[in-house]
Amino acid sequence: MVSRKAVAALLVVHAPAMLASQTEAFVPIFTYGELQRMQEKERSKGQKKSLSVWQRSGEEGPVDPAEPIEEEGNEMIKLTAPLEIGMRMNSRQLEKYRAALEGLLSEMLPQHAAK
């Protein structure tokens, strides 16, 4: 017969292995320290941009914040293919939001028909 210690050792190894195979584990790509450093870099980039806007406003007069700046990049994204947005609802959610959805559809359909 197999000793109790061997059975206990196999159980201790087998149980976590089974749990690990059944769960969807999240493996972080970045460590907590790396995330903090990246956030700090983003903050410093934001401060540099605001500083450059402030310096320009001193040289050229007040700068309108809504006015695009060359450094920020004036790229406009244009869709080349039709975009379809979908939503899944169960019957209870549909009953709950039916009036709001009908209102949105009635607003959107005349706009598309006019085009």
Swiss-Prot record:
Coiled-coil regions, chain positions: none
InterPro entries to which the protein is assigned, alphabetical: Motilin_assoc, Motilin_ghrelin, Promotilin
Domain of life of the native organism: Eukaryota
Key word Signal present: yes
Transmembrane segments annotated in the record for this chain: none
Subcellular location: Secreted
Region called Disordered, residue ranges: 40-74
GO cellular component: extracellular region
Pfam families: Motilin_assoc (PF04643), Motilin_ghrelin (PF04644)
Keyword vocabulary terms for this entry: Cleavage on pair of basic residues, Hormone, Secreted, Signal
GO molecular function: hormone activity; motilin receptor binding
Signal peptide range: 1-25
Family recorded in the similarity comment: Belongs to the motilin family.
Described function: Plays an important role in the regulation of interdigestive gastrointestinal motility and indirectly causes rhythmic contraction of duodenal and colonic smooth muscle.
PANTHER family: MOTILIN, PROMOTILIN
Protein name stated in the entry: Promotilin
Organism listed in the record: Macaca mulatta (Rhesus macaque)
Annotated gene: MLN
